[in-house]
């Protein structure tokens, strides 16, 4: 796929999953970390460097063996990376050393974001770690405030919530001997996150917004998509994209945000690498965050929608697997339950179990968040009822894996009309999906559906709409697929308004329009279109036409035999 060698500073679980993605693309990787680190366990190479990613000499050894140098952890020696840019001008380093410098010190990160007009929590430096200085912080920011380590902090380590002045001595003891800063407490209702990919050319691409749930300052769960309105997701996407645009270089970035009670969004922290909140992408998205990072730093193609969910109905929950606090390896019982749960995938990192140590994660994928949560409850032991799938359900799932026809409507009030199309497609054995996509109330969802449909294997779209009936035309404007419009009869004008709206499309945006409320014909037309891809559907259509003809001929013969009066009496 690519002859260049990628050097990775750090061989933990993130490096391990970068290597997994690289292996699929036949990209060679060399790793700098301790012997038998998680990433090295799955990469049999004599070129790996045993050492520390913060040691200048070890970093230089790695640089001599690669064409592109990247990181799986930001706590690396930046001066050495800057020297390498001079010493090895052909060596590409992503993210750029300057970006790593700006981000690895969290207070400098905040100052950079403020300078670029990005909304963040109010912060102040703690020049001297003393009770007096923290009393002054409490006076300026108010209690509670968060005391944070400026560097070398992750997974909740390096944070302490100071609820009142009596807690100051404890905070100083916990965070002693490190540079500190303080943040004003953000009264958030949810913590959100998003993975942002930045290309070599500076283009940015967003993954779905997710919601993270923390326990003991460590990420426990990640819900994808986030359980917030579409409008909030859009604002979060724009905020995160603008933040990443302010940094030089390329790669993937994890952006954590606070969603406040007021509806305001604030950036919490940024990581210049793959992130825990993006692990769900391995199973839920077209491209995982790890492959996306490789595509970015190697300037490989980034096709349209490569960061989107695999299907319009994809929902996911990521559960971190932490070392049990009391019994070593007890967390593996959770993994065993996950293996018995449909739609769940287990990822273990090859790390020795220690209390609260991340040793793996579990991705749970389903067509609804409620179904994801049902599976989560079994995996975590909240319920002992195993999740079973009947033979019929398995067949349904197999049919839904790659739907060929998308049936959409602007409102559930259109479903009685559109259900006839569903019945026809079932009779013809056509796999299809059904959902609600409002052109006016959910425009972003409509756009995402139209743009992603062809990438997901959909061959044609049936769109039902009443009233203004903009849905079929708007979808047709954003997809290369054939769109069949079904005018739905409303309370006014008997559906003629819908018919005129759909049929009168401008040149260049065709919509095949059927009669008012006639989703049956829409489905039959869809089957005919599918015949161009699969001759079995043409055969089924021929059989359908013969059956129609036979039904009419039987009726004609009966009418001719008994006469019209007897025919009407017995009909």
Curated annotation (Swiss-Prot):
Catalytic activity, reaction form: 5-amino-1-(5-phospho-D-ribosyl)imidazole-4-carboxylate + H(+) = 5-amino-1-(5-phospho-beta-D-ribosyl)imidazole + CO2
Modified residues (Phosphoserine): 37
The keyword Nucleus appears for this protein: no
UniProt KW keywords: ATP-binding, Decarboxylase, Lyase, Nucleotide-binding, Phosphoprotein, Purine biosynthesis
Binding-site list for ATP: 138-193
EC class: lyase
Pathway note: Purine metabolism; IMP biosynthesis via de novo pathway; 5-amino-1-(5-phospho-D-ribosyl)imidazole-4-carboxylate from 5-amino-1-(5-phospho-D-ribosyl)imidazole (carboxylase route): step 1/1
InterPro entries with a match to the protein in the record: Ade2_fungi/plant, ATP-grasp, ATP-grasp_carboxylate-amine, ATP_grasp_subdomain_1, PreATP-grasp_dom_sf, PurE_ClassI, PurE_dom, PurK
rRNA-binding found in the keyword field: no
E.C. code: 4.1.1.21
Gene Ontology CC entries for this record: cytoplasm
GO biological process, one term: purine nucleobase metabolic process
Xref: PROSITE patterns: ATP_GRASP
An MF annotation (GO) of this entry: metal ion binding
Domain ATP-grasp residue range list: 110-298
Family of the protein in this entry: In the C-terminal section; belongs to the AIR carboxylase family. Class I subfamily.
Miscellaneous comment in the UniProt entry for this protein: Present with 5410 molecules/cell in log phase SD medium.
Name this protein carries in UniProt: Phosphoribosylaminoimidazole carboxylase
Species of origin: Saccharomyces cerevisiae (strain ATCC 204508 / S288c) (Baker's yeast)
Organism lineage: Eukaryota, Fungi, Dikarya, Ascomycota, Saccharomycotina
Designated gene of the protein: ADE2
């Amino acid at each position: 796929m690519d002859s260049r060698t990628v050097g990775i500073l750090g061989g933990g679980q993130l490096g391990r999953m970068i290597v997994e993605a690289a292996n699929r693309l036949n990209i060679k990787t060399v790793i700098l970390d301790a012997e038998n680190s998680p990433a090295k366990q799955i990469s049999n190479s004599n070129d790996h460097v045993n050492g520390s990613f913060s040691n200048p000499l070890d970093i230089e050894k790695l640089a001599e063996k690669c064409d592109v140098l990247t990181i799986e952890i930001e706590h690396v020696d930046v001066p050495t990376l800057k020297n390498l840019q001079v010493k090895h001008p052909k060596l590409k380093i992503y993210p750029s050393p300057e970006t790593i410098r700006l981000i690895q010190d969290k207070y400098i990160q905040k100052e950079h974001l403020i300078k670029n007009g990005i909304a963040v929590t109010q912060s102040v430096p703690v020049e001297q770690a003393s009770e007096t200085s923290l009393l002054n912080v409490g006076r300026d920011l108010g209690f509670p405030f968060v005391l944070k380590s400026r560097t070398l902090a992750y997974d909740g380590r390096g944070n302490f919530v100071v609820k009142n002045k009596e807690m100051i001595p404890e905070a100083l003891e916990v965070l002693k001997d490190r540079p500190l800063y303080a943040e004003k407490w953000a009264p958030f209702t949810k913590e959100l996150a998003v993975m942002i990919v930045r290309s070599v050319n500076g283009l940015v691409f967003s993954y779905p917004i997710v919601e993270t749930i923390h326990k003991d300052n460590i990420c426990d769960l990640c819900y994808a998509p986030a359980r917030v309105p579409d409008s909030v997701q859009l604002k979060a996407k724009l905020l995160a994209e603008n933040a990443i645009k302010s940094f030089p270089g390329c790669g993937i970035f994890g952006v954590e945000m606070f969603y406040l009670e007021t509806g305001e969004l604030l950036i919490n922290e940024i990581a210049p690498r793959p992130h825990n909140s993006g692990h769900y992408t391995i199973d839920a998205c077209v491209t995982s965050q790890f492959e996306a990072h490789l595509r970015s730093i190697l300037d490989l193609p980034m096709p349209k929608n490569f960061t989107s969910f695999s299907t319009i109905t994809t929902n996911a929950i990521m559960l971190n697997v932490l070392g049990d606090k009391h019994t070593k390896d007890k967390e593996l019982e959770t993994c065993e339950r996950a293996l018995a749960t449909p739609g769940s995938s287990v990822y273990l990192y090859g790390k020795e179990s220690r209390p609260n140590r991340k040793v793996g994660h579990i991705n749970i994928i389903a067509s609804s968040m409620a179904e994801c949560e049902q599976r989560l409850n079994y995996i975590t032991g909240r319920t002992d009822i195993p999740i079973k799938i009947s033979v019929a359900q398995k067949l349904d799932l197999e049919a839904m894996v790659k739907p060929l026809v998308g049936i959409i409507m602007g409102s559930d009030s259109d479903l009685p009309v559109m259900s006839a199309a569903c019945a026809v497609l079932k009779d013809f054995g056509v796999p299809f999906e059904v959902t609600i996509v409002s052109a006016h109330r959910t425009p972003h969802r409509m756009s995402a559906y139209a743009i992603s449909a062809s990438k997901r294997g959909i061959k044609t779209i049936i769109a039902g709409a009443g009233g203004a009936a903009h849905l079929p035309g708007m979808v047709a404007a954003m997809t290369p697929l054939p769109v069949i419009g079904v005018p739905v009869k409303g309370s006014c004008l008997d559906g003629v308004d819908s018919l005129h709206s759909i049929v009168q499309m401008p040149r260049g945006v065709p919509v095949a329009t059927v009669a008012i409320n006639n989703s049956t014909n829409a489905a039959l037309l869809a089957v005919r279109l599918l015949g161009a891809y699969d001759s079995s559907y043409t055969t089924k259509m021929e059989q359908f036409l013969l059956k129609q003809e036979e039904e009419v001929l039987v009726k004609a013969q009966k009418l001719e035999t008994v006469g019209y009066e007897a025919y009407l009496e017995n009909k």
